[in-house]
Amino acid sequence: MLRWFTAGESHGMELVAILEGLPAGIPVSLEHIGNELSRRRLGFGRSARQKFEKDLVTLSAGVLHGSTLGSPVAIRITNSEWGKWEKIMTPEVPCKSDMSDAKRAQGLYKPRPGHADLVGMQKYGFQNSRLVLERASARETAARVACGAVAKAFLQQLDIFILSHVKQIGSIKIDYEQGAYPRFCDLEAIDSSPVRCFDKNTSEKMKDELHRIKRCGDTLGGVFEVLAYGLPPGLGSYVHWDRRLDAMLSAAIMSIQAVKAVEIGDGLAISALPGSEAHDQIVLESGLLTRMSNHSGGVEGGVTTGSALRISGSMKPISTVPRALKTVDISTRQPANADHQRSDICAVPAAAVVGESMVALTISCAILDKFGGDSLCEIKRNFSGYLNSIPKNLMSVIER
């Protein structure tokens, strides 16, 4: 069983992540984790914060000489801006002199619509929304991406590869034929796009739209898609509701800040089709079972089919709008404009990378549930043995 936790505040000393349940023998490097964290910073429309904040990563437990030990893995991401925030975000009771003049020490009493500010203040009885936003911030996803980097390293040992791309920003969307999805070999080209869009023409239109929305003092949301190749048939279960892989994946994507909807495969579009067109018909190809299409997104009945996994997340526009929205000053009970914190115009490209990590962690859980072992060698043996045990007349094509 794989469990993982994160801790830390947006402007705190560091983010901390713990991964428990990984087998021994997974190759892990700081370079790989650092590369994944740098991908999270990609995308036109990110805030100035991405330019001067650095993700300084430390593996403090569970990895020795580039390989996991089977014990909990501990990852620390130090805040490079901690010096500016140390007096304000100290866990100790601060001196009055440290808090008197600093602009950062001022309370935030104007909760931002669309954020967790007001509900967090109500839930915990806080009078200052900083006590909410520091943890609710999407900065926490850096720790998720670090965990996801380790999960990806594990999955790649089983020839399972995960990527993402942006399908839509605002009203601008990519239009491609069924089956013409990006492959893992396309990841470098996707990452080189300023909006991480697979199609060059659509990418330029998205960039133009972001320029326009920035001039208007507004923000945009959109849709990203995560794909996983190399998944064997049989991950997940139809036996219990909480073991259905599509349910677990949906929860994982929905947990990403600002995601408001999740679709697997063709998602909502399937509801408009007749049954004769909506389902993936099964045929024989070179002696193996395969499907003529992938409307289902690689999951049927909560179980993987062997086709590519496709899951999309729809992200609402960034809630911190430069053209401040109406709110109420909690300290005076008077109408006010919402506090404006430094933020992105659009974070869909970054959310896509976070989505990769959430999918990688969820699939890793399913892999360990089915093929669990104490070492990577043992899991590889179990994985191979399972594939070899499937009766020949039932074996499906595994899409890679």
From Swiss-Prot:
User: How is the cofactor bound, as the UniProt entry phrases it?
Assistant: Reduced FMN (FMNH(2)).
SUPFAM superfamilies reported for this sequence: Chorismate synthase, AroC
Pathway stated in the Swiss-Prot or TrEMBL entry: Metabolic intermediate biosynthesis; chorismate biosynthesis; chorismate from D-erythrose 4-phosphate and phosphoenolpyruvate: step 7/7
Asked if the keyword Ribosomal protein belongs to this entry, the reply reads no
Q: What class of enzyme is it?
A: lyase
**Where is FMN annotated to bind?**
135-137, 257-258, 301, 316-320, 342
Q: Which UniProt keywords apply?
A: Amino-acid biosynthesis, Aromatic amino acid biosynthesis, FAD, Flavoprotein, FMN, Lyase, NADP
Note the superkingdom of the native organism. Answer: Bacteria
* GO MF terms held by the record: chorismate synthase activity; FMN binding
Query: What role does this protein play?
Result: This reaction introduces a second double bond into the aromatic ring system.
Protein name listed in UniProt? Chorismate synthase
Source organism of this protein record = Tropheryma whipplei (strain Twist) (Whipple's bacillus)
